Amino acid sequence: MKALHFGAGNIGRGFIGKLLADAGIQLTFADVNQVVLDALNARHSYQVHVVGETEQVDTVSGVNAVSSIGDDVVDLIAQVDLVTTAVGPVVLERIAPAIAKGLVKRKEQGNESPLNIIACENMVRGTTQLKGHVMNALPEDAKAWVEEHVGFVDSAVDRIVPPSASATNDPLEVTVETFSEWIVDKTQFKGALPNIPGMELTDNLMAFVERKLFTLNTGHAITAYLGKLAAHQTIRDAILDEKIRAVVKGAMEESGAVLIKRYGFDADKHAAYIQKILGRFENPYLKDDVERVGRQPLRKLSAGDRLIKPLLGTLEYGLPHKNLIEGIAAAMHFRSEDDPQAQELAALIADKGPQAALAQISGLDANSEVVSEAVTAYKAMQ
């Protein structure tokens, strides 16, 4: 089996690329970073530090790389069995024209073996969005052929890959946590379902997308916002603070109650999942900075994201939400000189006051009880 993976950054090399190579798939990375491309083609291998209770170093081998903006990448799309991405949501649109060209070439060459494309991004139904961009870039006479022979498979991904703080100057070395989760929508594949260790197949992807958003992302953000307020440097420092831990765990339990109601998750299994996530936040090898995790507070306070969406679920089912409110209030206090959204948030609160500002950012009714609860909590933190 041959695969092409767009994005040879830390997540591409440390997570998806590693799983594919470990499964014995012939893997080519596509990227624009010439230093990384040259290193991959010189060595055909790289090291991944996998850190949990202990640290182990795995070597990923048998890989090569091409530029994502040249002809080579188009040729490969005409030949491979699987295309994956880890480029960031914004970049999906930029790689779509190359994918479209490759699909046209595949059709011209008469290659009718199934191709599956999986975007592995921190977003909901990212592959469906990529498909829209690819379809827009295709000539009309290729669209029906692509619909018939190419699967666009949505996925949910979860692995903490912090920015490399390695003392070496090796452009390929990467650190990842032991935990990883790659869940794909098995209803969207063309041809036989792949058997790749570390890839889980489901016919209910949205349940797992929300489970991650409402647990890992909610907990991570609240840990960062409360941690910043308490002058902690890292996520580990923050979660070891008992006061913060109680609120974070409480918020994940509140959002979890929504998931259990909505999707029928088993309550005991979900409690174990929350414990596992608290353990991930404590990982001593992950120097995860609270400022990095907290950045873009406007996005994180928007209606469909990790703080407001679970809160809306608690309102829908009439469930408690005291800790989620604490997290939202802490997010409103987030300040960072390096983050334009943090500055915009501060300006909005200064201009309109916390009540109107939160309503504008989150879409919540300014006169609602929850907004007033959040404003009370916000003022209590000043």
Swiss-Prot record:
EC number(s) given by UniProt:
1.1.1.17
Spell out the GO cellular component terms annotated for this protein, sorted alphabetically and separated by semicolons.
cytosol
Keyword terms, alphabetized: Acetylation, NAD, Oxidoreductase
Q: Name one GO biological process term.
A: mannitol catabolic process
From which domain of life does this come?
Answer: Bacteria
Return the SUPFAM superfamilies for the record.
6-phosphogluconate dehydrogenase C-terminal domain-like (SSF48179), NAD(P)-binding Rossmann-fold domains (SSF51735)
What are the N6-acetyllysine sites (modified residues) in this protein?
A: K269
Q: Which reaction does it catalyse?
A: D-mannitol 1-phosphate + NAD(+) = beta-D-fructose 6-phosphate + NADH + H(+)
Q: Family per UniProt?
A: Belongs to the mannitol dehydrogenase family.
User: What name is this protein filed under?
Assistant: Mannitol-1-phosphate 5-dehydrogenase
